[in-house]
């Protein structure tokens, strides 16, 4: 198993698909990386040489923000919004939808499981 950016990449899959297992790399970035390194798109991970794996690793480290760094930046952006006290920050703090979705019904993913209210018997 090749290890790139702290993630074990599945060996049986094509390189483009396997790279998407890294947080922050989707299909578009994976295709860009493969083109930059010059690896055929049909190549499987177990067919890669050590030099090619090293090239992929260096390209990702140099050009992309992935895994821990990306997660840290995202959480810092959310924390900044919460510290500012802006509307989006308040929504994050209260655990409600941030992007204008309705909350009268739905929004259960963001709000958590429904809480029973006492005194609602017939």
Curated annotation (Swiss-Prot):
GO MF assignments: rRNA binding; structural constituent of ribosome; tRNA binding
Region (Disordered): 99-122
Gene Ontology, cellular component aspect: cytosol; small ribosomal subunit
Key words, A-Z: Ribonucleoprotein, Ribosomal protein, RNA-binding, rRNA-binding, tRNA-binding
Transmembrane parts of this sequence: none
Superkingdom of source: Bacteria
InterPro entries: Rbsml_uS13_C, Ribosomal_uS13, Ribosomal_uS13-like_H2TH, Ribosomal_uS13_bac-type, Ribosomal_uS13_CS
Gene3D superfamilies in the record: 1.10.8.50, 30s ribosomal protein s13, domain 2 (4.10.910.10)
Biological processes per GO annotation: translation
Function as written in the Swiss-Prot or TrEMBL entry: Located at the top of the head of the 30S subunit, it contacts several helices of the 16S rRNA. In the 70S ribosome it contacts the 23S rRNA (bridge B1a) and protein L5 of the 50S subunit (bridge B1b), connecting the 2 subunits; these bridges are implicated in subunit movement. Contacts the tRNAs in the A and P-sites.
Subunit composition and interactions: Part of the 30S ribosomal subunit. Forms a loose heterodimer with protein S19. Forms two bridges to the 50S subunit in the 70S ribosome.
HAMAP family: Ribosomal_uS13
Family: Belongs to the universal ribosomal protein uS13 family.
Protein name: Small ribosomal subunit protein uS13
Species this protein is from: Sinorhizobium medicae (strain WSM419) (Ensifer medicae)
């Amino acid at each position: 198993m090749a290890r790139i950016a702290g993630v074990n990449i599945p060996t049986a899959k094509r390189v483009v698909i396997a790279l998407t297992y890294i947080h922050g790399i989707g299909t578009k970035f994976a295709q860009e990386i493969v083109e930059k390194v010059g690896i055929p798109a049909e190549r499987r991970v177990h067919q890669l040489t050590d030099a090619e794996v090293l090239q992929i690793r260096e390209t990702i480290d140099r050009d992309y923000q992935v895994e821990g760094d990306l997660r840290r930046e995202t959480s810092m952006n959310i924390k900044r919004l919460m510290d500012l006290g802006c509307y989006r920050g308040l929504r994050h703090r209260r655990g409600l939808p941030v992007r204008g979705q309705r909350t009268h019904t739905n929004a259960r993913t963001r709000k958590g499981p429904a809480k029973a209210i006492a005194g609602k018997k017939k």
